């Protein structure tokens, strides 16, 4: 209770849920944080950050021209255990679940439209497939 924060467990659950959906393999204890106000000495939750290794983004570990389904099975979570679902379920069992996505499969083309000029078609296609797979796996995170 050093920070005085009452809802850190829910915050941690949200991080674990988001990381599971995004396949974020780079969560570590240095990017689970709180912010301290120097003037008042009070703490608040930090925005969730560092998703750079999500959706199989590491092209060295997950080359673009191979089977994404084997990659999805192979990617490991951090920092508490190597299985995303197990890690997420442990956190949500202890602290509850707050994460709910407000988009559906039919929204994906529009979400990707602004990325056409930034990424090669093969990269966008793979990200699209990964998102759809994760939507199926974690359908409970989506509001209908």
Stretch-by-stretch model annotation:
Residues 1-14, 18-24, 29, 33-144:
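Anionic ligand-binding catalytic core segments
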